[in-house]
Every structure is written in structure tokens, then in C-alpha cells.
Amino acid sequence: MQASIESTGNLERRLTFTLPQERLETHVGGRLRELARTTRIKGFRPGKVPTKVIEQRFGQQVRAEAMEGLLRETFDSAVREHSLRLAGNPRIDQGETDFDFVATFEVVPDFGDIDVTTLSVVRATAEVTDADIDQMIENLRLQRRIWNPVERGAQAGDLVALETWSQAGDERLPADGVETGSSVLGSGVMFDQIEKGLEGLTKGEEKTLSVDFPAEWRVPQLAGKTVQVHVKAVEVSEPVLPAVDKEFIKSFGVKSGDAEQFRADIRTNLERELKGALMNRLRREVGEQLIAAYAHVEMPPRLVENEARSMLAQQVEQVRRSGRDPGQVPADAHQGFMDAAAKRVLVGLLVGEVARRNELRLESRRVSDTLRLIASTYEEPEQVIEMYRNDPQLMNGLQSRVMEEQVIDWIAERAQHTEQSLSFQDAIRV
């Protein structure tokens, strides 16, 4: 194979290689002959279509497919021959001839010795208690609450329907009329100064509150200012919670309406949530230790920038879902994610390197268990499992996640670690 490699940066390489023309022509010829035997074309007997006709119809497509396959095969062979380990996908450009190509790519940095036994990891532990189940049932009751209007003053837990307008200096917001809304006192949805000011307010009562708006507030006219907010309680309502009876239990999918089965199902769901939260805590803990130990290692610049752009894309999507205009996000906003992206790339490459050096293999049993766990959150688990198994992209994502968790566990088991006992609520507060 004709191939040469050169360094164009600390972690960037340029690979120049030539495709074997004879192999390409052999593959194209073989594929065209196969099509001549199997293709049905009006006016010709099966298997008797002239090669020229086949080439006219399919030659360009067959050659393009053969070129693409041989290009990938030749590139992969050259990478193995030169013992290169790529960080990200290559950019492959046409060379001087139709069979010459130049691939530019980044390689995994040299981490030197990776001794995970020097890391110090805090491993959180927690369990689901009866009190946690009781709290979840109370939360479910709150979800099904109804509101009963009252004539007394508003207190914590009450729903207050409001009309408001604000005065910021000489500017009134809105310029005409009022804004309407509602808030449950104590929920933290509104500023503390407003919530406290609403306490004791009765239906129809009005009040003016002095409110300090933060500098980053989304309404420029209010940001960083002390504003006079005029509020009127249109209605005050207290919550009425349903009894935990058979009908209530059945509404959450327990057909028997049995209270013990209801609690057992809640325990299963909470334990699943807890397992995920503890893994996220461990992933973050191990990641922070790896970053501290290997922050001096240079990361592939293009890989970091791609990660930063991916993080920005996630933020833009969040902005869009919130109803705001994603066009307000600056085009170069990804620069603000570069530090976080570099850390994420560092951890990802290190996890892959630990797996490679220690010959860690994906555990199919763990993949199956994780898939069943995911599927159990849906009404038709078997359909979800089938969907994953029939979708290579979904399965690849699942396998990558499981492999990462295996490596995180492997590192944590060998690192210096201490256990930290947490309550369920503290554990899931990641």
C-alpha cells in the first residue's frame, strides 16, 4: 500500500494514500456481472442483459459505492499499519489524481501511565425508606389536588390568582392594563419578596411591593433595578388533596387498587431513580478526579471545538423549547463552552484509554439489564426493547453508555475511595 504520514501539529496528522486501482476495477466488474445475472429489464430475458446496458444503467452508482467502500478500507488499513489512534472522524480530500487522497485527523494524546489507584473517590450510598415512599405518595396526592376558593388571607400552600403591573422609574410595565398569572405560595416560582408580600392577602385586596430584580433578568427594563410591583389578589384558593383509596391507587396503574402493591411499585420506581442518581454522582466524582490528575495533557483542538458546538446546540434547543427565540444566541457562543468541552473530551478519551489498556469488554448481560430498566418506565416495555434491538443507532448509544458505566465502576473499585451515606432526597439532588 502506498501511504505516508506526517505531523502537522502536536495532535494533528496528515495521511496521504493511494487506492489500489486494480482492486477497484475488479470489484466494479464483479458487481456489474452480478447485476447482469439478477436484474430484470424489459426487452431482455432474465440473466441475458448485456453488460453494456448494465453499465449504462448502474455503472456510475456501482463505481461510487465501490470507491467509498475501498476508500474506507484503505484508510483503515493505513491507520492500523502506522499504529494510529484517531480522536474523532477524519476529513478526507481528493489528491492529485482520482485515486490519491489526503486524510487530515487528530490522534489520541499520550496520557503516559494511567494509575487509577492514586485517585481519591467519594462513593455515595443511599437506600429507599418507607418515609421516602410516604413522601412520594404525598407528592402524587399534590398532583391530583383540587383548589377550593377561600375568603381568608393567603398562606403557604395556597394558590393565588393575580393581576400585576410594575413601575420602573418613569416606565410602566405593561404600558396599559395588567398582567395575569397565579402562584402557589411557598413553591419558589416567584421572588421571595413577592411571595412574602402576598401572604395574608385576601380576595380583591391590592398591595404595592418593592422588588429587587437581578441584573440578568430577562426583561431589560427591570434588570438590576428596584421596582414597585402592584399586585391584586383576584382569588385565593386552598388545596384539597384526594384520599389514598382504591380509586386513587388504580389511577396510577395498579389495577387491583391494593395499597401494598402500590407501595411496592413506588419503591421499584424510586430505586430505579436512585440507581441512576448514584451512577451520575460517581461519574461526576471520577470525572473530576481524572480532570485534576490529567489537566496538563493537551486535548485535540478540533474535537474540543466540535464538543463545544454540540453543547451549544443543546442550549439552543433548550432556548427553543422554552419559547424564546434561539436566534438571540450569538453565532460564536460555543466559545463559552470551550473549557467545559475540553474537560468532557478529556474524561471521554481517558475512559476509552482505560478500557483499551485493561482490555475491558462490554458486558452483554449489563446491556440487557439496562435496556430492561429503561423499558420498564414505559407502558409497553416489550415494544421498547424491540425498538432498541431494531435500531442500530439506539443500541450503539445504549452500549456506549453501559461501557462508560463499566469503566467508571472499574476505576472507582481500584481508586482510594470512601463511602458517603446519603438520604434518598440528597442522593437524587445531583
Curated annotation (Swiss-Prot):
InterPro entries reported in the protein's UniProt record: PPIase_dom_sf, Trig_fac, Trigger_fac_C, Trigger_fac_C_sf, Trigger_fac_ribosome-bd_bac, Trigger_fac_ribosome-bd_sf, Trigger_fact/SurA_dom_sf
EC number: 5.2.1.8
Keyword Transport: no
Catalysed reactions, as listed in the record: [protein]-peptidylproline (omega=180) = [protein]-peptidylproline (omega=0)
One Pfam family in the UniProt entry: Trigger_C
Main EC class the enzyme belongs to: isomerase
Any one biological process term the GO annotation gives: chaperone-mediated protein folding
Location, primary (coarse class): cytoplasm
UniProtKB keywords: Cell cycle, Cell division, Chaperone, Cytoplasm, Isomerase, Rotamase
GO CC term, one of those recorded: cytoplasm
Subcellular location: Cytoplasm
Domain of life: Bacteria
GO molecular function: peptidyl-prolyl cis-trans isomerase activity; protein folding chaperone; ribosome binding
PPIase FKBP-type domain mapped to chain residues: 157-242
PANTHER family assigned to the protein according to its UniProt record, in alphabetical order: TRIGGER FACTOR CHAPERONE AND PEPTIDYL-PROLYL CIS/TRANS ISOMERASE, TRIGGER FACTOR-LIKE PROTEIN TIG, CHLOROPLASTIC
Family to which this protein belongs: Belongs to the FKBP-type PPIase family. Tig subfamily.
Cited function: Involved in protein export. Acts as a chaperone by maintaining the newly synthesized protein in an open conformation. Functions as a peptidyl-prolyl cis-trans isomerase.
Entry text on domains: Consists of 3 domains; the N-terminus binds the ribosome, the middle domain has PPIase activity, while the C-terminus has intrinsic chaperone activity on its own.
NCBIfam families in UniProt: tig
Protein name: Trigger factor
UniProt source species: Xanthomonas oryzae pv. oryzae (strain KACC10331 / KXO85)
